[in-house]
């Protein structure tokens, strides 16, 4: 049973991760019936024609038209990414509610099983089957790090190393809401002190690997895919130095989030394109300097 549950819940983790990747691909491949790549190609071709005769109003208008179309499609993709983050967030809330509902049901089953089997005359097999099914479902949502039955027939469960179910009750998982974007973070209510603004997180999202067996559970995968915020090109830079993130910091940061990384990459494309075009058409630095030093120059 343990081996089956381990593989089953690992599948839940990667299935949820795969869905986010597929969503990104879908938005890039088709926006209003046209691939986003086509909008980039059309803009490139428009500039090719413009370069042949910049004074031609037809070429000028074509650039304006294709640039406007590119920006509108880019905005649609970006909005699609952010909307999907909200969808993931709603799913996380649903999953947290389901985990708590399972905990409540298991408390009831524990008590009923204990009452029936107290005399050591009969086994509450039907109730045990129900409890096993709930354990399977729970294992698909979160990483059950330990579960065992005591001599009284009561099942004890730990989630992510913290006690979830004991002989008396279950410990509820709360959802801390970010006021900026309304993204939720699961936390242990019994280990937190809200009055002191201290919330004990259920999941450690910085140390996930197949080697340690921490790549388990749908909620964790959804949290990673969603990330903790919306992103733009600035998220590839270090807040202190202003330079590009080191590969190590990148891997520990937004690289773990499918949606945040995709948003930052898309915005980087738009940013560099806009800056380079403006630096060519209305530069405040020599054009040769832009190309020679591969700079991102401010513009007016």
Segments from the language model and where they lie:
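Structural signature of extracellular appendage/secretion-system components
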Residues: 1-300
